[in-house]
């Protein structure tokens, strides 16, 4: 009996069965995404808070890890190579199994139902926590912009209950989550268009920083190149790795491309 239970836990679903289930008329997804849409979705997922927030910490370091200094370039190369190998795996899987589900579906086809179940719930937890963290971070930036404009939101409207000063809810964070949810519910094509607009804004910001910062480059600041040695470069690589993640979001849209 024990062997039967184990077999059921680790039973796999064939690729043919997965494709047949996805092609069922009752829950078949429309193929509306183009190569540009997928590219925009991928860039939008990758160029997130990581590239804007984590670089300073990776360069300088903190009390718990050394900084990379100018060697941050090597940290980006190491993290980029690691993510490239993972992205190639996702590309291979998404072409073999072009259905929604991403890592959950791939796990179901290769590792079994139980491990796929764990993977699926991990993905839900990952996206849920990431959504909350990004929404709170966006709320902080939004509040700072309002202060620069001379507008101060009440404390109770920007802080959750249970804090030292008390609050009702972080309404800016809740509102941005609601707006994004509405766009997603309207349709994937509309979501892709909204993502394309946001991607263009992100690229403009990055190009602006490059254009403004390039004239201020001072080669003297590149010495020493690795003040903390390879320990600093490795520690920074673990941080800037998060500036690359997000490419897996493309594989979730394979069924609609």
Positions of predicted regions on the chain:
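Select transmembrane alpha-helical segments in multipass membrane proteins
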Residues: 31-42, 112-125, 172-176, 228-240
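Extracellular loop-to-transmembrane helix junctions
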Residues: 53-161
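Membrane-interface "cap" regions at the ends of multi-pass membrane proteins
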Residues: 1-56, 60-69, 73, 84, ...
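Hydrophobic/aromatic residues within transmembrane alpha-helices of membrane transport systems
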Residues: 34, 48, 93, 112, ...
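Structural signature of transmembrane alpha-helix termini at the membrane-water interface
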Residues: 84-91, 132-135, 139-149, 182-189, ...
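Membrane-water interface regions at transmembrane-helix termini and the short interhelical loops
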Residues: 29, 92-95, 118, 122, ...
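Helix-loop-helix junctions that connect adjacent transmembrane segments
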Residues: 14, 20, 24-30, 69-73, ...
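Lipid-exposed faces of alpha-helical membrane segments in multi-pass integral membrane proteins
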Residues: 43, 47, 74, 78-82, ...
């Amino acid at each position: 009996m024990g062997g039967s239970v184990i077999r059921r836990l680790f039973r796999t679903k064939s690729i043919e069965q997965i494709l047949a289930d996805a092609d069922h008329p009752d829950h078949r997804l429309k193929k509306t995404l183009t190569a540009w849409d997928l590219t925009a979705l991928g860039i939008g997922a990758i160029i997130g808070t990581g590239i804007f927030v984590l670089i300073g910490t990776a360069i300088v370091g903190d009390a718990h890890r050394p900084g990379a200094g100018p060697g941050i370039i090597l940290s980006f190369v190491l993290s980029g190579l690691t993510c490239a190998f993972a992205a190639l795996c996702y590309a291979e899987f998404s072409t073999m199994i072009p259905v929604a589900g991403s890592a959950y579906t791939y796990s179901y086809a290769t590792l079994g139902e139980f491990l796929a179940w764990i993977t699926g719930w991990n993905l839900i937890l990952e996206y849920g926590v990431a959504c909350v963290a990004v929404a709170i971070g966006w709320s902080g930036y939004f509040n700072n912009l309002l202060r620069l404009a001379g507008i101060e939101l009440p404390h109770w409207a920007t802080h959750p209950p249970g804090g030292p000063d008390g609050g009702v809810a972080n309404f800016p964070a809740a509102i941005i989550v609601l707006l994004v949810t509405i766009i997603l519910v309207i349709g994937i094509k509309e979501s892709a268009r909204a993502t394309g607009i946001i991607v263009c804004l992100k690229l403009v910001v990055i190009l602006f920083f490059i254009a403004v910062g390039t004239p201020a480059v001072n080669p003297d600041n590149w010495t020493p190149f690795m003040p903390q040695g390879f320990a600093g470069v490795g520690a920074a690589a673990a941080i800037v790795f998060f500036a690359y993640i997000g490419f897996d979001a493309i594989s979730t849209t394979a069924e609609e491309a």
